[in-house]
Amino acid sequence: MNTPALLVLADGSVFHGTSIGYEGSASGEVVFNTSMTGYQEILTDPSYCKQIVTLTYPHIGNTGTNAEDEESRSVYAAGLIIRDLPLLHSNFRASESLHDYLVRNETVAIADIDTRRLTMLLREKGAQGGAILTGADATVEKAQELIAAFGSMVGKDLAKEVSCTETYEWTEGEWELGKGFVTPDKQPYHVVAYDFGVKTNILRMLASRGCRLTVVPAQTSAEDVLALNPDGVFLSNGPGDPEPCTYGIEAVQKLMESGKPIFGICLGHQLISLAIGAKTLKMRFSHHGANHPVQDLDSGKVVITSQNHGFAVDADTLPANARITHKSLFDNTLQGIELTDKPVSCFQGHPEASPGPQDVGYLSDKFIGNMKAAKQA
């Protein structure tokens, strides 16, 4: 791994490093993630589509990779930036090194970068376009061409690009030491899950709570969903700008009229908000990490959450029937709402973590409670 690599940002900043992945080039929005672990889950999170991820923890790759920690069918991050790749990896579950994993998944990555300097730059100026090029012939001019071609995340409807193309069933539950992934004996609730870029661990979290899931493509109509006669509807995470997802917004509006319990996270939270007339905005400082403090306004408690989003809901545009339930303690941005006249709730972060804590797993329990109440009514 002696191939030189180049990282260039839209503001003209240039970083020289070493290629540790697939040889080639990658462009996208450069962001930073503060998670100490979970690099494989981050790489395979579809919400990172068209984004180059900087990991702030200095040593990445210590535990290798394995098939069980993948959150989707492939790597979706456009590229990876790290400080140091260890020469050796060690873990009882490891089957492949991070380097080999990146090469096999054709993912461009760069190491030997001053990630502290890069993170401070992104923290001061905000997320911006960037490009990684590998090889001795990589030039700043070529990188600038790639950055210009990428443009911005604003206006990009990426959910339909990462979504499944066919409906499928899911029953597999969460991982247990010594057992692997466990499927519960009883799953009394039928949930239709919209795949806007869904992570497998949120499906497992719901399955472990008694849900049999039918996962549908992002552009599935409300009529087709209701024809499946679900007990509830789940709206997944996903990448890109939520406003161009008009198909999702229209479907949510019709589903809310049906009275079915609905729960959304991440992009799903934003689509619910847009469906009730609120507005979203591009964040200058996006949230990416597994240590974000959020306050539950009902209980007053602080929960530590996993976050991954570059757009947020403008709290000032919420209608009267939307009650704010959670707010970020980093920047006071809106983190959760529920409707006062319908069994609809949503959260901006990731209850399933992967990586990160599961402090807000109780939100999934509340969704289960709404379905139980609806079935008993």
Swiss-Prot record:
InterPro entries: Anth_synth/Amidotransfase (IPR050472), CarbamoylP_synth_ssu (IPR006274), CarbamoylP_synth_ssu_N (IPR002474), CarbP_synth_ssu_N_sf (IPR036480), Class_I_gatase-like (IPR029062), CPSase_GATase1 (IPR035686), GATASE (IPR017926)
UniProt KW ATP-binding keyword: yes
Active site: C266 (nucleophile), H350, E352
UniProt-recorded name of the protein: Carbamoyl phosphate synthase small chain
Glutamine amidotransferase type-1 domain residues: 190-377
GO BP, one annotated term: L-arginine biosynthetic process
Purpose: Small subunit of the glutamine-dependent carbamoyl phosphate synthetase (CPSase). CPSase catalyzes the formation of carbamoyl phosphate from the ammonia moiety of glutamine, carbonate, and phosphate donated by ATP, constituting the first step of 2 biosynthetic pathways, one leading to arginine and/or urea and the other to pyrimidine nucleotides. The small subunit (glutamine amidotransferase) binds and cleaves glutamine to supply the large subunit with the substrate ammonia.
Gene3D superfamilies attached to this UniProt entry: 3.40.50.880, Carbamoyl-phosphate synthase small subunit, N-terminal domain
UniProt keyword annotations, A-Z: Amino-acid biosynthesis, Arginine biosynthesis, ATP-binding, Glutamine amidotransferase, Ligase, Nucleotide-binding, Pyrimidine biosynthesis
UniProt-annotated stretches for the region CPSase: 1-186
Pfam assignment, any one: GATase
Alphabetized PANTHER family for the sequence: CARBAMOYL-PHOSPHATE SYNTHASE SMALL CHAIN, MULTIFUNCTIONAL TRYPTOPHAN BIOSYNTHESIS PROTEIN-RELATED
MF GO annotations: ATP binding; carbamoyl-phosphate synthase (glutamine-hydrolyzing) activity; glutaminase activity
Quaternary structure, from the entry: Composed of two chains; the small (or glutamine) chain promotes the hydrolysis of glutamine to ammonia, which is used by the large (or ammonia) chain to synthesize carbamoyl phosphate. Tetramer of heterodimers (alpha,beta)4.
Family according to the record: Belongs to the CarA family.
Binding residues for L-glutamine: S47, G238, G240, L267, Q270, N308, G310, F311
UniProt pathway: Amino-acid biosynthesis; L-arginine biosynthesis; carbamoyl phosphate from bicarbonate: step 1/1; Pyrimidine metabolism; UMP biosynthesis via de novo pathway; (S)-dihydroorotate from bicarbonate: step 1/3
